[in-house]
Curated annotation (Swiss-Prot):
Residues 68-71, 128-133 are annotated as: Homodimerization. Homodimer and monomer. Part of the TOC core complex that includes a protein for the specific recognition of transit peptides surrounded by a ring composed of four proteins forming translocation channels, and four to five GTP-binding proteins providing energy. This core complex can interact with components of the TIC complex to form a larger import complex. Chloroplastic protein precursor such as prSS (precursor of the RuBisCO small subunit) interacts with these complexes. It holds the Pfam family AIG1. This is Translocase of chloroplast 34. It is an enzyme of class 3 (hydrolase). It comes from Pisum sativum. Residues 93-96 are annotated as: G3.
Length: 310
């Protein structure tokens, strides 16, 4: 959980939360420090228009990323850093990965370049709860993330579903709709990322988020979901658990971004190929030549020459 080269401001936005939420957040930050974790970097990714920037603003408690329903997302990633009680929180907001029904390779390359020499402690993969179905685009996004940062990034991942203050269709119970929506999305993510079901990476936690100012509140003035959960402390608690799991954080270096060099990879096989050629081709041919020489009948002129010399 490396430190990042970034202007770090005091996390004053935490004071805008309800006192009960502040207490829980400071307790969670204290738990991280007890584990010698003094900084945390969260990478926020997903399709466009799913609420990534709003989620960053909600976690920080400030309007740190500009958002507008009438404007497209910013073309470049933004890292916001805040410090509190000796702990530094870095959150990286990124542009959507889909453009015109395909992966936006330009946006993906910009994101990878931005992340060079940074460490990803948690991936927050954002989508919407009120999306009724999954499709091939979800699979493409999961594949693009995996191809860029490796399968290991899903060991440090959380799926976050926004627009959680949502009434399911046809009177379906809220928890049942959430369960079905979560499993459908996780199944596509596993498929796109080529994850095995029995692998740790398949056990990706799913959290609910409601960024609207109209979010309901409990008696402690905390923002709560229809299931009664105070979502900001629950999200930060899940982030803490993922950050402290046994999987390693992802350090983004040039080799990770560029992938294996096919030319260099081919060079590694050259000595083995030569050895096999010698064993299975050159050596047998050499033996055949020697045998032919040994059994070859000498021509008459060579025999005469030998007799004349005598």
């Amino acid at each position: 959980m490396a430190s990042q080269q970034q202007t770090v401001r005091e996390w004053s936005g935490i004071n805008t939360f309800a006192p009960a939420t502040q207490t829980k957040l400071l307790e969670l930050l204290g738990n991280l420090k007890q584990e010698d974790v003094n900084s945390l970097t969260i990478l926020v990714m997903g399709k466009g228009g799913v609420g990534k920037s709003s989620t960053v603003n909600s976690i920080i408690g400030e309007r740190v990323v500009s958002i507008s329903p009438f404007q497209s997302e910013g073309p470049r990633p933004v890292m916001v850093s805040r410090s509190r009680a000796g702990f530094t929180l870095n959150i990286i907001d990124t542009p959507g990965l889909i453009e015109g029904g395909y992966i936006n390779d330009m946006a993906l390359n910009i994101i990878k370049s931005f992340l060079l020499d940074k460490t990803i402690d948690v991936l927050l993969y954002v989508d919407r709860l009120d999306a009724y179905r999954v499709d091939n685009l979800d699979k493409l996004v999961a594949k693009a993330i995996t191809d860029s940062f490796g399968k290991g990034i899903w060991n440090k991942a959380i799926v976050a579903l926004t627009h959680a203050q949502f009434s399911p269709p046809d009177g379906l119970p809220y928890d049942e709709f959430f369960s079905k929506r979560s499993e459908a999305l996780l199944q596509v993510v596993r498929s796109g990322a080529s994850l095995k079901k029995d692998a740790q990476a398949s056990d990706i936690p799913v959290v609910l988020i409601e960024n609207s100012g109209r979010c309901n509140k409990n008696d402690s003035d905390e923002k709560v979901l229809p299931n009664g959960i105070a979502w900001i402390p629950h999200l930060v608690q899940t982030i803490t658990e993922v950050a402290l799991n046994k999987s390693e954080s992802i350090f983004v270096d040039k080799n990770l971004i560029d992938g294996p060099n096919p030319n260099q990879r081919g060079k590694l096989w050259i000595p083995l190929i030569f050895a096999l050629q010698y064993l299975f081709l050159a050596k047998p041919i050499e033996a055949l030549i020697r045998r032919d020489i040994a059994t070859e009948t000498k021509p008459a002129w060579e025999t005469r020459d030998v007799g004349d010399r005598k």
